[in-house]
Structures are given as structure tokens and as C-alpha cells.
A protein has these predicted regions:
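Transmembrane helix-loop junctions at the membrane interface of multipass transporters and ion channels
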Residues: 549, 553-576, 740-750, 771-780
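Canonical P-loop GTPase G-domain recognition
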Residues: 231-286
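Juxtamembrane inter-helical linkers in multi-pass membrane proteins
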Residues: 433, 437-441, 494-524, 599-623, ...
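Conserved G1/Walker A P-loop phosphate-binding module
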Residues: 90-172, 190
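Extended helical scaffolds that flank P-loop GTPase cores
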Residues: 248, 275, 282-451, 658, ...
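Hydrophobic core segments of alpha-helical transmembrane domains in multi-pass membrane transport
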Residues: 407-418, 480-485, 563-565, 578-592, ...
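Conserved C-terminal guanine-recognition region of P-loop GTPase G domains, centered on the G4
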Residues: 159, 184-251, 558
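Extended, low-charge hydrophobic alpha-helical regions
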Residues: 354, 361-362, 381, 422-463, ...
Length: 780
């Protein structure tokens, strides 16, 4: 029987894990190992993927992958609280554990030397929150796997000569995805002085798997038990001193969200790094397990490769365990000769025979066996946490078979309605009135002061009209980001990926691709960067190329501007139509890509589902401030400069004389060359062509340029009909993203792909806008 056939609510024991390569290794690293108990929680609304519970946390995988995992001993699920037995008093030895558990690897570092730390941990364990507490930085914090997609650096507040690097969240040191490679390369190649390993205390079993691999690196290390406040609230606890003794490293209970225990963590981290106190334990084998098969294997490999590991700069214990599980990248770096490779294979094959498991499963089993001993002796866990019980209740609706899709549509519809018709629209009108009043005051003041007419025109017709028109849409953008950050912080985004996986698979993507694309509704740049969390290069490229079709918030001023001018009272409907048009075109492009450039199937859907959490007010406020600040910076830099340039080109002719009619200006001459391209679309006016060009710098510039050139939406309404306005909206929706987004695509995929995005989306936008205008002309 396979895991695919396990009934909901039943528990079984894993017997074998099929498959091959990096995916199988990833399953083993996530805890799907022989003898592990696994519970079937539920099926996705469309029947695939499934959610299972293993080692105390929820994991999603597809039926095709579940079919590769064989099980037996099917039984009813019984959840028991974890209570350590035979406890004995263990006293805390002091700062840095007083060297009690450590091996000093060298002389203390000289004063003034920079202490570099790697901040490493599983995805969604509070790592970025801790980084912000340590450094005072304001990095993005979320409640779904894959928030950190690049390394970020910062100095520890109040401690000189320190540098902490926030690395992407990983489950193991196996190279399954690009973020795991980033973390692994940093630790192995850049040699940090210390490692701060953050662990989710509500799920220690899963998190300690990475801890054991980090300890094998022989780098001074501190373990931060995060979310201890939740553990205590649920009646659980961790016997910290006993855990320190068993692991051989300092263990510090903290709550990063509440800033508890951070100072003690800093003291321990600085101490072990400064005095070069490496972990006191790196051998996790049981010499009595299957006659010490794994133990003899690892020590035999260590003897064989010791000199090679030293030359390659890889800790010998880490290299031995990775070779034993079949890590090809480590094998390539060691440069073993043919005889040594044959000896290595003989050692591992002998271990497999004695152990009764293949090499990867044997090493994973060795690690989880040690973890179970540690947790059994040190962790007090309730039968079920309040957070988990609450998540199960909420998921009955948000991931239910008949309620998940309607709930998603309802939630997104509510977000758009509140943003564009209620909160955002109300605040935007207030700000617009304020900007208008300020413009009148400045206008009257400059007129009274008899300011030069050219300068007067620059300030009022250029800066105030252009920048002011964009600023009035700030509340709409902030409101949308508020709701998106609430959904992200709560953990709902991960559920959307779970619900949508089967649907996205039909167009060649994984459910995990939905997260970068949802982020793309806020801004394309972080959406493109978030694609790094995808383990498949094929999926990553497809997701990057499709994300620009998701309408970003910078286009909201364009939609609002035209909706107010041509479709009054129907703003929300216009927004919904445009957003769904972008999604539909993205789907069509995905199908085209799947059949041409990116043939093949999407990678397996393996993702952790975090518990729902109440979004932190500080995190939400921080994100809103960042987005507002970014918008204001763009308004007073790119848009400000673009507005002045447009005003100048519109005000003067080729001989730099002031023109009485803007159609005689420099701008009219330049844009006149391009305008005929858009005539078949219903907006072949040079002023609109100019606005579209400036939109490449920043989408908000489209509105500021039109306002400068036309003076008001009323003048624009005399030029365009509602049909041509609809055609223009579709073009703005689909044509090339802004220069910042193109730069991010270039950084991820290279210059050829970035150029392809610019040209391809302009062509698609032209065709779709022409289709709208042509079809509309037949019926209107």
C-alpha cells in the first residue's frame, strides 16, 4: 500500500521511499524516512495534492509522489503529549557554556577583527524577524515559506565589528533549490566566524535536522529556540540545559517577535565566535545501531578523504556524511582518484547491506534517530497547540473541498472592493483635495509675486500637476499592500498555493509559483525575486516570465485615472476586468510556453503549511511604510525628473522658443514618429505615445505625463472614446514592465531574456489592445 491510498485521519508507518535524485533526498530531509509515522490530513479541493502530518508538522505533496512512498501498519491516529522521562538536574554552566561543551579550534580572535555570523534556519521559522531585532533592519517578514530569497547583511546593534548575514531558509544542506545552494556556498566558501541557528521551538524535531548538519561544519554555533512564548502558552517547555549537554552547543530560548532573549543570544554568539569555540559534538551515530554500520561507514570515509577535505576547504565530518548520502557536488570538489572512489563506493555499499537501507535513507535515519533521543529527553509538548487547533478549524473553510475556491474569490474580491471603492478611494479623494488646495495657494503666491511665466509654468503645470496627480493615488497603493501583507503574514498565501496546485499544473507550473505571482500584484520586482524559492529552473523561468502579466500596484493610478474619466462609478468593475484579463493572458502564455520553450512537467509540489498566525501590527506597519516610502521616492525622483523633461520638451520647439501650441513642440515631433503605430488601436495621438514611453521608467509616470500634456482628464475625454480608452487600458496592462522590473529579470535570467520580455510584451499588448478595439468597433 502507498501513501496515496491512506484514508484521511489514519496514520501509517513508512516502509520505503521511492523515487530518485534530489527530490528523493528532499523527501528524506523533510522526514519521510522508513519507520516514520505519517498521518493523512486532507486532500486539496481538486483532489491533488495532499496534506500529511509528519514529525509534528504539515507537509504537502502530490499524489504521484505519494504513490512512491510505501506504508504499512495503518491505524487510527492517536496524538499523545510529549513528556521527557527520567529527568535529572542539569545546571547552566554560564556564558558560552564556559567551554564545557566546546572544542577551542584556535587562539581567541584579536581585538578589532570583524565577527561574521551566518543566520541560518528552516523556512518560516522567524529568521528574518530575528535579523531585524539583531540589526535594527527592516527586512520583509511573512508567514509562508520563502520570504528571504537572497542574503542580506547587517551589523549587530550596539556591538562593534560584527556582521550578520540573513540567509535563505532551508531544510537541509542538500542542494535541492537555489536558496539551499546560496546558504551552503556561503557557509562553506565564505567561512563565517559563527553560526546563529534559529529553530522553531513549536516544531523542534523538523528543525534540528538542519542543526545537525550545521554542527558538522565545525564552526562556532549558537542555537536560538524561537517562539518559546507560544510553547509556554500551550503548556509546553524545553529543558534547555539538558539539550545543551546533548548537543554540545549553547541553546538560548527567545521570542524574536517580542524581543525576548535577544541580548543573551548576542552575548553567547559573540563569545563562541571570539573564542573560536566549535560544537563539542559532531558524531551522532549510535555504535550499537545495526552493529555500528553507519558509524563504521562514516569514520572509514573520514579516514579516506581527510587530506582531500582539508585541501578543498570542507570540514571532514560534513564531507563524510554528504558523501555517504550520495552528494555529487561534494564528491566533485574532493578530487578523489579512481582507486579512492572505488574504495568509497565499497565502504558505502557495505553499510547499505548491513543497515538494510539505501545510503541516503540510512544517513537520514541516523539523524532523525538522534533527534528523537534529544527531543524525548528535553521537550515537553502538549497534545495539540492552540495555534494548530485554530489552523485546522480555519482550513475547513479556506481549504475545504467546496469552499476553498469561493473563499479565495470572495477574499480577493473583498480586497479589491475595499481598496478601490471604499478605503483607498476615500483617502485618495482627500489627498487629491489637499494637493489641489496646495497647488492653488502656490499658484496664487507665484502670480502675486510676478514670478517669471516660464518658471511659473514649470512649477504649476509641470511639477505640481504631474507629481501631484501621481501622489493622489498613494492611499490606493498603500491600502492594497495592507491587505496583501495581512494575507501573507497570516499564512493564507501558502494555502492558496496548496489549493491552486492542480490548476496551475495544467498550464505547466507548480502551486508554489502562485506565491511569486501573487506578490507580483503588489510589485513585479519582489515577485521576480521570490521565484528563487522554486527548485526547478524550468518553473523558475516560466514564473519570472509570467509574473509581469500580473498587474502591479504601480498601474493602479492609470486604471483609476481612466476609470474616473471614462467609466464613472464602475471603478471596481474595471479593476476586476483588467486584473482577470492579465491573469487570462498569463495563462495563455503559459500554455504557449509549455508547448514550445518549456516542454515537460512542473516539479513536484513539496511545501510546508505553517499555522495561521495573527499578522503582527509592527510587521504590517513596517511593510506599509516601506511601500509608501518607495512610492514617494519614485514620485520625487524618477517621476519628478520625467515630469520636468516632459514639461520642457512640451514647452519649447526645436529652436528652444516657447510654443503657443504644444503640437509644435519638440515632444510632438519625437512622439509623432511613434504615434502612427497606435492609430489602429484607437489612441494614435502623440501625447499618449509620450505617456507610454515615460511609463517604461515608472508606470505612475503615464498619469503624470498625460496630466501635464492634457491639463485634465476632461481634455483627454474629448480625444478618446470609452472604447479607445478601454483599448489603451489593455495596452497599459500588458506592455513592458518598468525599468526596475526589467532590471530584476535581467539579473535573474540575463540580458537576452530581459530584452525578450520588453519586445514580447509590447507585441502582446499591441495585439490584445487591437483585438479589444476591433471587436468593440463591430458592436458599438
Amino acid at each position: 500500500m502507498t501513501l496515496k491510498d491512506l484514508p484521511i485521519g489514519k496514520t501509517a508507518t513508512v516502509t520505503t521511499v521511492g523515487g530518485e535524485g534530489a527530490l528523493r533526498q528532499h523527501f528524506l530531509d523533510m522526514g519521510l524516512i522508513p519507520k516514520a509515522d505519517v498521518t493523512m490530513v486532507k486532500f486539496a479541493p481538486m483532489g491533488d495534492p495532499v496534506e500529511v502530518r509528519i514529525h509534528g508538522y504539515e507537509l504537502t505533496l502530490r499524489l504521484a509522489d505519494a504513490e512512491k512512498i510505501e506504508i504499512d501498519k495503518i491505524r487510527d491516529t492517536i496524538t499523545e503529549p510529549m513528556r521527557p522521562q527520567g529527568a535529572r538536574p542539569i545546571f547552566h554552566p554560564g556564558l558560552g557554556e564556559g567551554g564545557k561543551y566546546h572544542v577551542q579550534t584556535g587562539e581567541p580572535l584579536p581585538p578589532g577583527e570583524t565577527l561574521t555570523f551566518a543566520l541560518a534556519g528552516n523556512q518560516n521559522c522567524g529568521k528574518t524577524t530575528l535579523f531585524n531585532q539583531l540589526t535594527g533592519s527592516n527586512q520583509h517578514v511573512g508567514n509562508f515559506p520563502g520570504v528571504t530569497v537572497d542574503r542580506k547583511d547587517g551589523a549587530i546593534r550596539g556591538v562593534e565589528n560584527t556582521l550578520v548575514t540573513d540567509l535563505p531558509g532551508i531544510y537541509s544542506m542538500s542542494p535541492y533549490s537555489s536558496e539551499e545552494l546560496v546558504t551552503r556556498r556561503f557557509v562553506l566558501d565564505e567561512h563565517p566566524r559563527g553560526i546563529i541557528n534559529i529553530v522553531d521551538a513549536t516544531n523542534i524535531e523538523r528543525n534540528l535536522y538542519l542543526t545537525m548538519q550545521l554542527m558538522e561544519l565545525d564552526v562556532p554555533m549558537v542555537l536560538a529556540l524561537n517562539m518559546m512564548d507560544e510553547v509556554r502558552q500551550n503548556g509546553g517547555s524545553v529543558r534547555v540545559n539538558e539539550m545543551e549537554e546533548m548537543l554540545g552547543i549553547p541553546v538560548v530560548p527567545i521570542s524574536a517577535a517580542k524581543n525576548e532573549g535577544i541580548e543573551e543570544l548576542i552575548d553567547h554568539a559573540v563569545h563562541v565566535a571570539k573564542y573560536r569555540e566549535a560544537p563539542g559534538r559532531q558524531d551522532f551515530c549510535d555504535v550499537n545501531d545495526h552493529n555500528g554500520a553507519v558509524h563504521r561507514c562514516l569514520h572509514g570515509i573520514m579516514s579516506l578523504i581527510e587530506d582531500h577535505a582539508y585541501d578543498a576547504g570542507i570540514p571532514v565530518r560534513f564531507a563524510a556524511s554528504k558523501l555517504a548520502e550520495g552528494d555529487q557536488l561534494v564528491l566533485d570538489r574532493l578530487n578523489l582518484d579512481q582507486n579512492e572512489k572505488e574504495t568509497l563506493e565499497h565502504i558505502i555499499t557495505q553499510m547499505e547491506k548491513e543497515r538494510g537501507l539505501d545510503r541516503a535513507a540510512a544517513i537520514a535515519d541516523m539523524r532523525f534517530s538522534f533527534i528523537q533521543k534529544v527531543c524525548g529527553a528535553t521537550v515537553v509538548k502538549p497534545k495539540e497547540s492552540r495555534e494548530h487547533a485554530r489552523s485546522v478549524a480555519i482550513d475547513r473553510i479556506l481549504t475545504g473541498k467546496y469552499t476553498a475556491i469561493p473563499a479565495f474569490i470572495g477574499i480577493m474580491g473583498l480586497v479589491f472592493w475595499l481598496t478601490f471603492n471604499v478605503i483607498g478611494a476615500f483617502l485618495s479623494n482627500l489627498l487629491d483635495m489637499g494637493i489641489g488646495a496646495l497647488t492653488d495657494i502656490v499658484d496664487r503666491g507665484m502670480t502675486a509675486a510676478n514670478v517669471n511665466p516660464v518658471l511659473h509654468s514649470l512649477v504649476i503645470d509641470g511639477i505640481f500637476t504631474g507629481v501631484g496627480s501621481v501622489l493622489s493615488f498613494l492611499p490606493v497603493i498603500v491600502t492594497l499592500f495592507f491587505f496583501l501583507s495581512m494575507l501573507e503574514d497570516s499564512g493564507y498565501m501558502a494555502r492558496v498555493a496548496f489549493v491552486m496546485d492542480k490548476l496551475l499544473r495544467k498550464i505547466g507550473l507548480s502551486g508554489r509559483s502562485v506565491v511569486p505571482m501573487l506578490i507580483g500584484f503588489g510589485c513585479t520586482v519582489p515577485g521576480v525575486m521570490a521565484s528563487r524559492t522554486l527548485p526547478s529552473e524550468r518553473d523558475r523561468k516560466m514564473t519570472i516570465l509570467l509574473t509581469p502579466f500580473m498587474s502591479c500596484s504601480a498601474k493602479l493610478p492609470i486604471y483609476s485615472f481612466f476609470a474616473a474619466a471614462f467609466f464613472p462609478g464602475k471603478g471596481a468593475l474595471v479593476m476586476v476586468i483588467l486584473y482577470f484579463t492579465g491573469i487570462l493572458v498569463g495563462i495563455l502564455m503559459a500554455l504557449l510556453m509549455r508547448g514550445t520553450m518549456f516542454k515537460g512537467e512542473a516539479v513536484p509540489f513539496v511545501m510546508e503549511l505553517p499555522n495561521y498566525r495573527m499578522p503582527g501590527a509592527k510587521n504590517v506597519a513596517q511593510l506599509l511604510w516601506e511601500k509608501a516610502k518607495d512610492f514617494l521616492q519614485r514620485a520625487f525622483t524618477v517621476i519628478f525628473v520625467a515630469t520636468i523633461i516632459i514639461w520642457f520638451l512640451q514647452t519649447f520647439d526645436l529652436r528652444f522658443n516657447i510654443v503657443s501650441d504644444s503640437k509644435d513642440s519638440i515632444l510632438a515631433v519625437i512622439a509623432g514618429w511613434i504615434a502612427p503605430i497606435f492609430s489602429p488601436l484607437g489612441f494614435g495621438d502623440w501625447r499618449i505615445s509620450t505617456a507610454l514611453i515615460t511609463g517604461f521608467m515608472a508606470k505612475e509616470s503615464v498619469v503624470s505625463t498625460l496630466t501635464v500634456l492634457f491639463g485634465s482628464s476632461t481634455a483627454l475625454a474629448t480625444l478618446l472614446t470609452p472604447l479607445s480608452a478601454a483599448s489603451l487600458l489593455v495596452f497599459c496592462l500588458l506592455y513592458t514592465p518598468c525599468v526596475a522590473a526589467i532590471a530584476s529579470v535581467k539579473r535573474e535570467l540575463g540580458g537576452k531574456w530581459a530584452a525578450g520580455v520588453v519586445i514580447g510584451q509590447c507585441v502582446i499588448a499591441w495585439l490584445m489592445a487591437g483585438l479589444v478595439y476591433g471587436m468593440g468597433s463591430l458592436f458599438i
